[in-house]
Amino acid sequence: MRALAVDLGGSHATCALVEDRTIIRAKTLATEGSVGLGPILPSLAAALCTVMQEAETGASQCAGLAFCFCGLVDHAQAKVISTNAKYDDAPRLDLKGWCEKSLGVPFAIENDARMALLGESYAGAARGFDDVVMVTLGTGIGGVAMIQGRLLRGKHSQAGCLGGHFPVLFDGRQCTCGAIGCAEAEAAGWSLPEVCRTTRGFASSSLAKDPITFERLFGYAEEGDPVPVEVRERRLAVWAALTVGLIHAYDPEVVIFGGGVMKSASMILPYLQSYANRHAWTPWGKVTVRCAELGSRAGLLGAIPLLQGRAAS
């Protein structure tokens, strides 16, 4: 089975042709979330046509287009419900109509975190598990749950996909969503520079010399610089508290962590596993904490199960 897939991020979009558990062809375009989704739809359609041509595949050979979107999505109605400072015109767009007119294939859309979990369940670290929570650590924090082999969506399509907005500190930092002390506000990539700059001793630390990233944070912490060490330990504590909260909320067999931060998985995973073992209330046994396997391919590889309806709520 072949399918088209679009994975839309804040700064780029990947358009691909997938077959079963393999990406046959892919083309990545630069985008700008602040500009909106409408202006780039022609470019997305053109890129999808290009990957089909390169693979000598016609639209009639594709099961449809699976669209991976960075916002709240009503999968059943095939539309975007709400955004957060990226592609804010999306709720007003008829994406299904655009797809049918431009490509002539069926259309399905899902939240990016859910699509990543579908991919990991189909071809990666969640394969063989029916009850899974996945957390993506990057610019933001994505969270999604699968219960008894079915994606958790809820009455308003919000269930399970707002893990980054679990409150972890009642008097913490202001989040972009408007709440206080969300996991994102305390330990996501977008909040990291401010967290570092407001830490005592920052001006004389290694972090003051370069643009602040998680990769540099963990690197300088390994060298023993006290400011990066302090910030790193606080990030780990937030992620660990979030892990336990998600375990208590969704009763998974396994919690999977993905995203660019997991380049430091050899240090992060043992911390999270140890914390979960000590603090999660799971009398039946221990929840496994593991690293995602598919990286940036996860959302694209979620196309086949999404179009087949394998994980419908």
Regions found by a protein language model. Name each.
Residues 18, 110-121, 262-313:
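Glycine-rich phosphate-binding/hydrolytic loop that grips phosphoryl groups
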